[in-house]
Amino acid sequence: MEKKQSILSPIIRITFTFLVLCGLVYPLIVTGIAQAVMKDNADGSLIYNDKNEVIGSKLIGQNFTDPRYFQGRVSSIEYKAEASGSNNYAPSNPDLEKRVEKSIEEWKKQNPSVPVTEVPIDLVTNSGSGLDPDISPKAASVQVDRISKLTDIPKEKLNQLIKDQTEGAALGLFGETRVNVLKLNLALQELMK
């Protein structure tokens, strides 16, 4: 009996020690460093309106249904963060073809002046997470005609808006040139005032 206690005692102490270190101390240290070094990122990269209310995060896409605004990528989860993910069908899967065809049909209804051959792939396909906040500058540009007609904002101003909101690759190395749809639509909203 005494031998069992002598074996169990260090096991319990080590378990408790690592539980405290890994479950409490380490997360608090990392959170503290993140808050000190990059507070905006640590808090979720939130975007606020004029009344200081959170309206979204620049890291999570939103569904913009009003045709006066720029549309983001297709999302099979309707931008619900708790259901993050996509079906990720193989290119040979007929369900992928159906999903893309449906996206193209919806696109044609909203943007009849843009030939389907000019629609960038990111506007008719899902991302891996279903939450992408960004689109390519070309995906934003092909929507200018529709938005200009509906808002009476000149195309030149809308193209400049896209240019102003375009971000390059992170550190000039990672990712692609992109436009954050939420930030772009907030800038567009300012033009509509």
Swiss-Prot record:
Q: Where does it sit, as one GO cellular component term?
A: plasma membrane
In the record, the note on similarity to other proteins reads: Belongs to the KdpC family.
GO BP annotations, alphabetical order: potassium ion transmembrane transport
Per the annotation, which location comes first and is thus the protein's main one?
membrane
Q: Which PANTHER family match?
A: POTASSIUM-TRANSPORTING ATPASE C CHAIN, POTASSIUM-TRANSPORTING ATPASE KDPC SUBUNIT
User: Is Ion transport one of the keywords?
Assistant: yes
The answer on whether this UniProt entry bears the keyword Transport reads: yes
Listed GO MF terms: ATP binding; P-type potassium transmembrane transporter activity
Q: Which UniProt keywords apply?
A: ATP-binding, Cell membrane, Ion transport, Membrane, Nucleotide-binding, Potassium, Potassium transport, Transmembrane, Transmembrane helix, Transport
Quaternary state and partners of this protein?
Answer: The system is composed of three essential subunits: KdpA, KdpB and KdpC.
Compartments in which it is found: Cell membrane
Q: Which gene encodes it?
A: kdpC
Entries under InterPro entries matching the protein: KdpC (IPR003820)
NCBIfam families (UniProt xref): kdpC, PRK00315.1, PRK13997.1
Q: How does it sit in the membrane?
A: Single-pass membrane protein
Q: What protein name applies here? A: Potassium-transporting ATPase KdpC subunit
Q: Which spans are transmembrane here?
A: 14-34
**In UniProt terms, what function does this protein have?**
Part of the high-affinity ATP-driven potassium transport (or Kdp) system, which catalyzes the hydrolysis of ATP coupled with the electrogenic transport of potassium into the cytoplasm. This subunit acts as a catalytic chaperone that increases the ATP-binding affinity of the ATP-hydrolyzing subunit KdpB by the formation of a transient KdpB/KdpC/ATP ternary complex.
